Each structure stands twice: as structure tokens, then as C-alpha cells.
Amino acid sequence: MPVRRHILEDLHRSLGATFGEFAGWSVPMSYEGTLKEHMAVRREAGIFDISHMGRMIVSGEGATELLERIYTKRVSKTKVGFMSGPTLALNEYARVKDDEMPYRLGEEEWLIVPNAAVADAMLEYFSSIASSMGLNVSIRDLRERYALLALQGPGAARVMEEMGGGDLLDLKPLQFRENAGIAGVTAYIVSRSGWTGEDGFEIIAEVEAAKRIFKAAVEAGAKPAGIAARDTLRIEAGFVLGGHEYGEDPLRWPCAVSLRYGLGAIDWGKKGFVGEAALRACRREGVRWIRVGLVMKKKYARMIPRSGYRLYVDDVDVGWVTSGTFSPVIGRGVAQAYIDSRYAYIGDTIEVDVRGKRGEARLQEFPLVPLGSRG
């Protein structure tokens, strides 16, 4: 399959972006360097183009019923004008297809933003489940028409105000507004949300409007940031990514209970969703693997735990790294990992095999760094 191109690619090339492939897309990986972009988001503000992610509208009688069948959270409790917060779509083995945050546009109208690697598959999956339930809902793909931007950081509100979006500063977390004016254009949707652990806004706008907004954000002081920085930021924050922390194959991936997603992603009082029986069995029987955070100890600060590296306690192989990076915030290697539940004690020391050398790390809860404004 040919590599897909971002609908704002020309803009990013004009800003000096370097490109790489991610989930079948040619994406801006960085502009001035991942370290600078990462710290800009932690200290002030950065703006990302995340248009490689999915965007689809599910509407019509039965749309909410469809989402209740697919998701582990009771999304029907979500108020119009708000996102549901994170929830999971499972397969019948209680493995995770995707983690998503549906936007409720109306009583029977939702905006879904699947992760890039599964956007096409989720479009087909929604249609398949709707058909099996006998629901005549409309499912529309918006990716060709609308871009998706993320303005993130403790200074995101300042940048938004300078762009003329001051009336959006009263948005609560996970609240959104339709037809919002920014930078002299109208955005389809602006939400108070993000995936970096910082304050911020996610903006869905038609292509030309999105170009205007991106440029205006940069002029107001937001640093253009690439996908590489978005990944290091989400690792620090403890946010998951398909193909790293979860996947559908039961021979490779632990069940969703092991993910310890938190944030109310699973409503244990809910019944009737795909994968429910397997999920309850997994919880009842207990899990072998637990997702935890790792922070390298000071002596081993420059050792970076990468995906696939093995973990040891007294020479016993007890798990593996799912995602890792060097944290510029604390100056140490950090990671997310799965560890045998018998050894998953926060605060304990574990060894990471980094290219044949062992380094000590501390097991830590998420987030792995302090979040919010910092100097």
C-alpha cells in the first residue's frame, strides 16, 4: 500500500519539517529537533498536525446504542458538547482494538477519532457491528475534508487568546465547541483536550482554515512540533499507543485489565459490550502481566530503555519494555513496560537489559514526570 500524505504536507515542508513514516502515513517527525519541541510543550506551547488520525461521524437512530455495544464505558452518560473521556474498544478476547474519546455532537450524533493505524479498520468495524445489530446508522469519513491539530502546553491558552479564540478559554476539560472562530476563520470543532499531559486544545478544521490556524499559532509563539515529540510526551504522561501497549492478538498481548488504563475507561457496572465475558473472566482469574512505569536510576540515567528490551529481577526474566525514551524533563531514561504481576511493586528496583548491559530502574506510577507548568 502506498504511503499516505498529510493534507497539510506543503505547509510543514515550508516550515522545515523532516518527514518519516508512521502507521502508513508520511508525517512531520520534527522541525527544529525533538528535544526542543518536547520542552516547548512542557514549558510553553507547541502545535502538532495529527491529521493522520481518523475522523468519522456516526449518526442516526441507534448511533448511541451502537457505541454502547462497542465501548467499555457507558458513553450514553456523556453530555452533548462534551467528549466521553478515554474508553476502549475490545475484541472478543478482551484485547484492545483501540482507545478513543468520542465527542457527543447530539443525542444520536457522535464524532469518533480512531488512532491512525486502525482508522480504516475501525470504520469497517463500526459498519459491521451496526449491520449485525440491524441499525441503520450513517457513518461518514471526514479525513479528506478536515485536518486535525493539537495546540498543547501550559501556554496553550495564551496562544489561543492571541489567535482571537479568547472565548474558548472557558471550555472545561473534555468540553468542545462547534463553529468556533480562531485566527479569522471558523473551526468545525475545538475541544479542551490532548494527549501530552498538558493543558491544550484539539482543533478540527477544513484544510485552508487549518493552515491559517497553524500559521497563526506559530506566529503567537507556539513551536511547530512533530510526531516524535508527541510520542516522547505521551510516554512521560503514561498514555498508551496501539502496537506498543496493546493489540488484538491474544498470543502476543495481555488482556485489557493488564493495561491499567484508569481514567474510568472501563465501567464494570456496564453489560453487553463486545469482549465483556472475556474481560470479566480476566479480572476474576487475575492477570499475569501489569503495565507499569520505569525510571532509570541516577547512575544509569543515560541508558534508554527501548521497546522490546527485557526486564530482570535476580536474573529472572520478568517482563519487557513497551515504549521508552530519554526524558528531557528529568534527564533520565523512562519507559512503560509489562511486568509479571508477582514483581509489580511500585518503588521496587528492576534491571533493564539495554543492548547487553544491565541498568537499574525504579518501578513508578504514571505520570513519570511532573506535569503542568515548569521552568
UniProtKB/Swiss-Prot annotation:
Signal peptide coordinates: none
Q: What class of enzyme is it?
A: transferase
SUPFAM superfamilies per the record?
Aminomethyltransferase beta-barrel domain (SSF101790), Folate-binding domain (SSF103025)
A molecular function annotated in GO for this UniProt entry is:
aminomethyltransferase activity
Query: What positions belong to coiled-coil segments?
Result: none
Q: Name the catalysed reactions.
A: N(6)-[(R)-S(8)-aminomethyldihydrolipoyl]-L-lysyl-[protein] + (6S)-5,6,7,8-tetrahydrofolate = N(6)-[(R)-dihydrolipoyl]-L-lysyl-[protein] + (6R)-5,10-methylene-5,6,7,8-tetrahydrofolate + NH4(+)
Keywords annotated in UniProt: Aminotransferase, Transferase
State if Transferase is listed as a keyword: yes
**S-S bridge residues:** none
One Pfam family this sequence matches: GCV_T
Record's superkingdom? Archaea
Subunit organization:
The glycine cleavage system is composed of four proteins: P, T, L and H.
Q: Which family does it belong to?
A: Belongs to the GcvT family.
Q: Which NCBIfam families match?
A: gcvT, PRK00389.1
Q: What does this protein do?
A: The glycine cleavage system catalyzes the degradation of glycine.
Name recorded for this polypeptide: Probable aminomethyltransferase
Show the taxonomic lineage. Archaea, Thermoproteota, Thermoprotei, Desulfurococcales, Desulfurococcaceae
Originating gene: gcvT
